[in-house]
Structures are given as structure tokens and as C-alpha cells.
Amino acid sequence: MQTEKTVEMKKENMILWVLVLLFAVIMSVPFLVPHTGMLALFGLIPLLSMERIATMLEKKRVWIYHYSAFVIWNAITTFWVCNATVGGGLFAIFANSLQMSAVFGLFRWSKRKFKGALPYIFLAVTWIAWERFYFDAEISWPWLVLGNSFARTLWAVQWYEITGALGGSLWVWACNLGIFGLMTSLSDGSWWNFNIKAKAAAVTGCMAILIVPFIVSALIGRKYKDAMAAPESLETLIIQPNIDPYNKFQALTQQQQNAIFLDMAAKELEERRNDTTAAPILILAPETFTSDIIVGQYDRSLTWRRFTSFLKEYPDVNLLFGASSYDYIQSPLRPSHTARKMGNGLWLESHNSALMTDWSGRTEIFHKSKLVVAVEHTPYPAVFCRIDDLLGGVMGRCTGQDEISLLNVKDTEGQNIPIGCAVCYESVYGEYYTDYIRKGARAMTIITNDAWWGDTPGYRQHLSYASLRAIETRRAIARCANTGISAIISPTGEIVSETQWWTPAVLEGRIPLRDDMTFFVVHGDITGRICTFLSILLLLALIVRFRSF
């Protein structure tokens, strides 16, 4: 008898683990394979089924199953972080999974007091509330926001111009819960207790949730089919120097890197030499191209001097490049938690910056403000910077800006074309990214260095998220990546032209200049705010119910 029970338990456990693996695989595919975003619309069903079966079987320690499910999903989709930092990659996988599992655990806890569909509604809105919180948290890693599943299925989500990516998260939850609800009612027999009208309403509602967003997307997308043919445009020259960041200073000096970059630019600009009548052109260099910039003292930089000297022959050319930049501060006291002591009352603040310059030496600078945890940013600096000092300063201490600022392309008559420049990781943050447009950006640029991850899905995912930003803001993007993939992206998110990975390349094209603002730009992340509000209300109701008994 005991043997039969043991065999039965093994079968039950096997079913649960199969559902765990099925969830992880289905939800990973949209992040890895183009045009598979629709899988996310039912990818959560195995996880929900696992939880329901485990509850019916009165399994103990169900958290092991759902935590394992999230770990496997995170590992399959973001393993590539380990190429840059093994410790950071493992921390991202396990810590991110822990937060997901905590949200799911809260849902299981709510089932003790909430009945019917309410616990599942609580799960959906709390998950989206957590995603919204994650965008602004000190330790932030919103890579696997459910709405990002459609980053390479763009035809289905042109309505992101209204909702942003969290609208996609809501769609994922609505479809999964709708289908799961129908499956549950069929499996427990309650479906047969519904009258014809109730059955029709359930099926119709489920179909509407699934199909209507596709129709809306098609209707909205038609408005922008000629978006690249705007009355005004900016010519861009994207230069991908293809310099291995792991050997950046061992293999080549900065002067040699400058020479490589300028040689590539000169070949494309030959016809513009000393032409004062040509339309302005913007040249892009990648993130952290140089590391010799002192803020406010640009003429001390060999790279800056070399660039401005080169540009004197091209009065219509503006150059945007990335740099590690520094502020030196003389103070008897530490000016900030992130400042590093240099000695004799001198302190150093570091930045990951984008600079715009031209033949006149005019220089504008923007500091990246959404920073990679540990690599660039020490979270909760009042606490962890002190610990980091004791460890010898192993964590990044970059500082950003309090608010976004724009960079200006100038023509030969001194007229400005305001553009935004999202530096690398900033392009993952949808609502933050809209600030560039609200400030007046007529087009967008992204500069990045994705080579740290090697030839993995990481740089492809990063590129695809830029397409979502284009849809949300309806601004074309010129994207420059050190080793690829550089691209020109239309306001519909379509990649108009692109370079190859790990290849020196120059990409030339025009990006339209626009002044309109989408609903998402004007109003922000309404989906996230509403879900946060509902989550708090339901959580308070849950606490009250627990305290009442």
C-alpha cells in the first residue's frame, strides 16, 4: 500500500515539474525567437495549472515549484549577463525570481480569504504594480516585464503608444486568466451549470480579450505606414567601430581608436568637406567611446580636441559620442556619498555621459541616469558606499542627472534641432524615456556598448526593446552600438536598416523629425498607476479580512 502511495506521489510531482518546465520554456521563447510574442498570451497557464493542482493535492512547500519556475525562466532568458559578471548574473537570476515568487506567494496567501476570480485579479494587478515599482527601484532590473514579450512581434502592439509596455503585461494576464478560467470551469464541471447566455458571454469575452488588441493595433499602425517620409528629417551617420571592450586599452591606445573612428567617418564625409551650404548631419559614436573627459574642461581631453579639429573641415557636421566623464571637486568634506577620495581635499564624481560637439567647439553633455546596479551604480549609497569603501571600492559610483536634458544638432545658420540621447540601459525604461519627448526631442538616439555579453541573446533583446520605445513615443531612433547591432528604427518600431554583429560598419540614413506626442507620452503609465491603486486596495481588504478572524 505504501509503495502504491509513493508511486502516486511521484506521478503527481512529475506532473507539477512538467508544468513548471512548460511554463519556463513557453515564456522564454518570445524573448529569444522573433515573431513569437503570442505565446505569452497562454504561457502563464501551465504555472496557474501547477498551482491549482498542487492546492487540490494539498501539497506542502509549493513555493519550491513556483520559485523554481521563475528561476528557470530567468536563467533561460537572461543567462547572458553572466558573460559580463558571473556574480551579477546569478544575483539577477535568483533575486529577480525571488521577487516574482513573492508576488505569486502573496496570491496564494490571498486565496485563504478571497474566493472565485478575486485572487487571480489580485495576482494580475499586483504583478503589474510590482513591474511598475521595479522601474523606479534602487535595485532595478525590469528586463522581463511581460509586455516586453512582444518586442519582436510589433505588428500586434502598435497600441503601446497609448498604454506603454505595461499595457502588454495587462493583456498577457487578461488572456491567460480568461483561458485558464474557461479550462477550470470545464475541468471542475461548473461550465455545465452555466446557461446559454453565460456560456456565450464567457466565450465571447475571452475571444474579445484575445482578438480586439490585434484589430486595434492594425488600425493604429495604418496611420504610421509612411512615418519615415516626414516633411523634415535629419541625416545621420552611425559609426560602429567594433572595438572589443575587454581589450580596449590593452590592444589599442585611445589615439588609435580615435583614428579608426575618424577614418571611417572621413570616407563617408568626403563630399561635404568645407561645404557651408549642406544640410546638417549627425554622426554617432557608441557609449563610453573615450574616458578622458573632465566636465567643463573639455579642451583637456585629447579625444575632444581631435574631434573638434576634424570637424573644422565639416561645418555642417555634429558629432555625438559617449564618454566616461569626471567632475573633480575640491572640498574639506565629502561632497556626496558617491564621491571617491583622491587626496588633499580632492574628490572625484564619475558619469557615463553623452556629448554633442561641432566645429566651433560647442559642447553639450548629458549624464546617463538609469544606471546598471553594481557595475555603474551603488544602490542605497548612504549605506553601501561605506561598505564599498571598506572593500576597496569595487562597485560603480556613477551619478546621473536629476532630470533629463536634450542635446542639440545645429545647422550652419545656428538653428537647433533638439534630440534625445538614451544611453544604453536607459532605453529599457519606457516612462522615463518619454521625458525626452516631453522636453521637446524631435528624434531619438541610443548609444550603447553591448559587447560585454558576447554573441548571446542579450544584445538582440536590447535592440528589440528600442523598437518598443519607438512605438510608445512615435519617434524614430538612430542606434549606435560599439560592436552591433546598430540600426535605424522607424516610429512603428520597424528596423529600417541595421549592421551585422561584431563587424566594423557605417550606417547612413535619415530619421524623420516629429513634434506630435502620443497618449503615453502625455499621460504616462496609466496602466501601472491603476494596477498599483487596485493592488493596494485589495491588499488592504485582504489584511482587514485576516484581522477580522
Q: Over which residues does each language-model region extend?
A:
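Intrinsically disordered, low-complexity coil segments
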Residues: 55-59, 187-201, 225-230, 270-280, ...
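Solvent-exposed soluble domains appended to multi-pass membrane proteins
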Residues: 253, 280, 285-549
